[in-house]
């Protein structure tokens, strides 16, 4: 079984057994609020994405990349976007299907591994919404290249990205214990740490990989915001461990 398959199975289990925060679909009431223009979405754990980062949704073709769960895509649909969601977790996609059926709207649901070429034609989308998820893949730069390929000229890429700080520290977030890069495929200690926490396979990525990767793909970065991880000692000390970015093709 590939590490990607293990991660998908892990996320399915988190949703079934652990009431995972990012696997909870929005309620009917939240959907109605979005229809009435009262909405917010997240790319990273705490901060909401500024509305001005999106522009007008009406008639825009939007891809939620590794964005299953029924949290953001229903909102974008309510605001007038034509949405596609790609994820590798069956449970995350089932949440999307459930909300779409409940609220009676159409969404294109695609099960695919984002480490492979994305199953879309060139210049298919106006917006790609890519919340924190590339911590579950080893190489991020090919994903940014694929995003550039499938976005229309002038299209917007919105990303939630974790920093290396998340992977430096021990479980209590009190000591720096791991050297970088954090890669359980190459480091037994990293693998054992993740197995102890039932965290699947996760990987650190540098700013050169994540910001530089977008620039190398051809994007122009227009906005960056810091964020914390929402809980734990690093959060309590207001240490930023995530960033959200807006880039344009």
Where are these regions (language model features)?
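Conserved alpha-helix/loop element of class I SAM-dependent methyltransferases that forms part
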Residues: 25-60
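Conserved class I S-adenosyl-L-methionine
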Residues: 156-189
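Short alpha-helix
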Residues: 201-224
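A short acidic, Gly/Pro-enriched loop at the edge of an enzyme's catalytic core
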Residues: 115-128
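Class I SAM-dependent methyltransferase SAM/SAH-binding core
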Residues: 60-117
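A short SAM/SAH-binding and catalytic strip from SAM-dependent methyltransferases
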Residues: 126-141
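Core SAM-dependent methyltransferase catalytic element
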Residues: 217-219, 233-249
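A short glycine-rich, Lys/Arg-flanked "PGG" loop and its adjoining helix->strand segment in the class I
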Residues: 141-156
């Amino acid at each position: 079984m590939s590490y990607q398959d293990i991660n998908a199975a892990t996320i399915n289990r988190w949703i079934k057994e652990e009431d995972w925060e990012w696997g909870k679909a929005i309620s009917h009431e939240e959907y109605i609020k979005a229809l009435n223009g009262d909405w917010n979405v997240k790319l990273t754990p705490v901060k909401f994405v500024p509305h001005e980062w999106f522009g007008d949704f009406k008639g825009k073709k939007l891809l939620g990349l590794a964005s299953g769960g029924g949290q953001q895509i229903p909102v974008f649909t309510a605001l007038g976007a034509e949405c596609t969601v790609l994820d590798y977790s069956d449970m995350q996609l089932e949440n999307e299907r459930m909300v779409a059926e409940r609220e009676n709207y159409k969404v294109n649901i695609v099960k695919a591994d984002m480490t492979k070429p994305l199953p879309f034609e060139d210049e298919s989308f106006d917006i790609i919404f890519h919340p924190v998820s590339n911590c579950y893949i080893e190489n991020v730069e090919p994903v940014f290249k694929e995003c550039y390929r499938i976005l229309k000229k002038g299209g917007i890429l919105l990303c939630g990205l974790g920093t290396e700080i998340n992977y430096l520290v021990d479980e209590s977030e009190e000591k720096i214990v791991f050297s970088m890069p954090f890669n359980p495929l190459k480091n037994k200690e990293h693998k054992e740490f993740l197995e102890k926490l039932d965290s699947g396979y996760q990987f650190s990525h540098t700013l050169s990989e994540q910001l530089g990767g977008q620039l190398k793909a051809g994007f122009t970065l227009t906005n960056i915001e810091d964020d914390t991880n929402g809980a734990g000692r690093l959060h309590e000390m207001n240490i930023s461990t995530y960033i959200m970015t807006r880039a344009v093709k």
